[in-house]
Amino acid sequence: MPVELHILGSSSGGNCALLRTGHTKVLVDAGFSAKRISLLLEAAGESLDAIDAVFLTHEHSDHAQGIRGLAKRAHLPVFANRDTAEAVQAKLTKKVCWQIFQNGMEFIFRDLKVRSFCVPHDAYDTVGFTFAWGEEGDLFSPPRSLAWVTDLGYVPEYVKEHIRGVQKLVIEANYDEDLLERDKRRPWSTKQRIRGRHGHLSNRVAFELVEALSTCGSLQKVYLVHLSKDCNSIEIVRDKFACLEHKLSIEIIDPEGGTAPAPKCQTC
């Protein structure tokens, strides 16, 4: 069975994805209610009862609010670093089945090799993940990997090193710089937070990262996620990344739900 990634939803309203291998089914983040996650999984042909674990990037509600309902499943492992686990648990009455990892250490969960790495964001200890599977010399299951990188204000060199060489990349393209600047509903302080070094990635910075990684030869597919509903649009993101479509498969996750059509190929 090929490894599948289903982005169940991604926006400031909630983030959650299903990573499914032949032997393992995990959620990356749980930014919706447990009931909503269950419905989204059913739409993807999966059951919440079949989920083997949850991996959390950080404690913000659009990534972790579903843990409240999932905590009723007493034996469901939830992987997080200590600061994230403590921040989430402090808001709950039920004890979560925490599996604490140290940032930067590789560990095995079933048929997945997992490594976390710090990313700059205004939470206690935000991380990204790489997930790897397959074996050298196995014609039916060769080595493959995926990087999950959302909620970061800029891309340090060490983050680039962690994600260089993956075949699939999930990266945020949160806002268009001009739309954010012109937005009259957000106060100046909020705009500064969003575009600061512990905020979110603009379309421009996300594009520069993907363009650089596209020259490495290993990257095959990119998922653009966490689009702002107010300060970004599918059309702007599509136009920005269109010139890379001849090199990569690019999937834009609609913040209203679903997947936007692929960019039309243009010359960079």
Residue ranges with predicted function:
Residues 1-44, 127-150, 168:
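Conserved beta-strand hairpin/beta-sheet module of binuclear metal-dependent hydrolase folds
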Residues 6-16, 57-67, 85, 116:
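Structured catalytic core of nucleotide-sugar glycosyltransferases
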Residues 28-31, 51-59, 79-82, 147-150, ...:
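Active-site neighborhood of phospho(di)ester-bond hydrolases with catalytic His/Asp-centered motifs
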Residues 34-80:
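Active-site metal-binding motif and surrounding structural segment of the metallo-beta-lactamase
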Residues 61-64, 85-88, 123-124, 155-157, ...:
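Active-site environment of divalent metal-dependent phosphoester hydrolases
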Residues 65-74, 89-90, 232-240:
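Metal-dependent catalytic neighborhoods of phosphoester/phosphodiester hydrolases
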Residues 81-143:
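Metallo-beta-lactamase
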Residues 157-254:
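Cap/insert and terminal regions of metallo-dependent hydrolase folds
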